[in-house]
């Protein structure tokens, strides 16, 4: 990917309110901290559900009743890492939880990220004629790391995004969605799930 420069204080904020699908499972240990993985189901206005992967420090999952599919509020940020195992998708997208609390109210799925376009946008039309632009946004975090977040833009926002060359800084607001697709592999078709930010608004910052 082309070298890009980002704003000094990029934003990466996620707010999810949904139903826990299953009890947390141990993921890994890093620098003496143990992390759990859990799945949150968040309903859209259309009635469709997004099943989103959450990574959380075990201190956040302790002391909360996690049985019988409770509703939870998760605040955090989107993280990405490359999967080099050769199994499943290469770019893994999760929500890194900063807080997890009980919730008793309406579902919520809101994302605000700022970063730079790091791959040439792809503009296209759906079979129903809707305009779409796919782009990848690089969002900086501490220690010179970056998260690469796939984004999908619609309509007039898609037209604007299609005109953004690599290095363009954007602020995108929308939701984190899950989408099933079929990947053709040497062993035959394989169903996979993609995670991407579906943009409601996108604003150029430079």
Tell where the protein language model's regions lie, with residue ranges.
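OB-fold and OB-like single-stranded nucleic-acid-recognition modules
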Residues: 1-206
